[in-house]
Amino acid sequence: MSDQTSIAPLAVRERFMSDPTLGAGNFLDRAVEANPHRAVPFAFSHRLDHRGQVVLRGHSLLDLVALRDRYAAWYHANGVRPGEPVGVVIAEGLEPLLHFFALTALGAVPALVNDAMRHDVMVRYLSHVGVVGVVADDTTRLASAYRKDPQLRPRFLSLTAEVQAFDAASAALPEGYPYQHAAEDVVALIHSSGTTGTPKSTMLAHRQFWEGKQPRMVRFPAESYDRLMSLMPHTHAGGLSYFMTTTLLGLPTVVMSDWRRVAVEPVMEAFRPTMVASFPRTFVELATGELPTAGAAMVHSWFNTGDSAHYGHIRRLVQLGERPAGLIRPWLLPQERAEQAALPGSQFVDGLGSSEMGMALFGQVTSPETERDDRCVGTPSEVVERAAVLDEDGVEVPDGTVGLLAVAAPSITPGYWNNERLTQSFRQAGYWLTGDVAYRDAEGRFYHLDRTVDVIDTLDGPVYSLPLEEVLLADCAAQVQDCSVVGVPHPDGGQRPIAVVRLQDGASADGLLEAANAELAKAGLAELAALRVADRAEEFPLGPTGKVLKRELRTRHAGLLSAAAPARP
């Protein structure tokens, strides 16, 4: 990596904060216009050479623009026009971001699809979106799926390699390129994780997706030594959000194409990040077994976005790395002047957000000095206009009462593509319902207990799965590497909670149910009716973004308690 900085001067970053035309559709152009270090590499891809050594390749802002323009010429030559949705089914890494840039520069709407999605689900999703074309790393299975129903086939179904090999000199870009977006223009479609069924298609708008991120221009660590490893799926709003931030900052960033520890740790050792951004899936692996001491030696901050991570994993990660003197407080927290001295260990910034929220709208920071506070996601960020806990009728409930988490903020999605009815179902009393169950304490801190679809309906009342998982992961850590708690039918009526666990290497499940229930009783939580060990990957199913598919666990174990129960007289 170059010794010359790629980071935009503070004055440039401050101007971004007040630019009324800046948004998700033109942030690359704004960055290349304003950053005097536009020729210095900042975005890094990675690969292994023939000796198994990590090779990092840097791309400057100018490099990204050149690649974008070449890809845009291919799309334009293939008939893509403003407002048309195009499917992008490309493996994680920098490549899907280049296609995002190319399509938005034409005013088209990239429908970014995680290539791990099942192909039958993918075809249903792309057909619902109404894409005019699809670019994919491998079109074989998609083509086969479309042959079963030719009416669904889009105008083109092309290989990524075809776009990469295109001779851009043979095609012209359209007049008025790059496209000038209006604030409300849709610039991307992001699918949900599919944990509840067919993925929803969340719209990201030009200005909406930038709202709330302005404070990052001055409150995201961007010292000369700072480097970010981005493990977010870059076909997801989280990955796009972080890359928008680092592009505008000019912050050196390695865009990972693989989230597994076996791939991540060697790149950490080569890149030496000071920050790591990920969904919980990678944090679980990094916190398991021997810690990645060498790769995380310089890490001062871990950023999690999505469903909040678990304390049992967080407490191990924050023992790694070091915090430099004056480390700024993240944008998710109330603004305060940083005065702390250099400290050992790191901070874990746990943000509760979603594609629909546009970013993490709640934030909690855990460091080695922080006391345990299970399921706390902190207070709303400054972009949030209102945050509340509502009952089913949309009435705000008192502090300490569990209800539906609701937010009002300019970062909230315009809605779901081609599904106004679904969009309206998430709007209530001027709020957006996040799909989460939570409560607020008297100090204004929010506690995230479950997704609404995962609440366990017992005869004694609702049981929330996430607090139970916290206990298993933190207090049964010698045996439990990861777990998921779901509700299944009980012969006496209602549901009871069961746990599906992945054991630590070499650990046994002997006595685990009894030990877990003893710890749950100490915490005042419901006990588990049963426990099952997931020995194989298919027994602990994950969605395209790495989230556990609880619906599949509920189906798999639906008869567990009925089969185990004695026959009724």
Name the predicted role of every residue range.
Residues A521-V548, A564-P569:
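AMP-binding/adenylate-forming catalytic domain of the ANL superfamily
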Residues P41-G79, E84-G93, L97-F101, R118-V123, ...:
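Conserved AMP-binding/adenylate-forming core of the ANL superfamily
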Residues R57-L62, V187-E211:
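Conserved AMP-binding A3 loop
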Residues A409, G415, V437-E527, E552:
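AMP-binding/adenylate-forming catalytic core of the ANL superfamily
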Residues A309, I314-E443, T452-V455, L468:
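Conserved AMP-binding/adenylate-forming
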Residues A77-N78, A105-A168, Q180, A297, ...:
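Structural core segment of the AMP-binding/adenylate-forming
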Residues W210-R227, T235-L291:
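Conserved AMP-binding/adenylation subdomain of ANL enzymes
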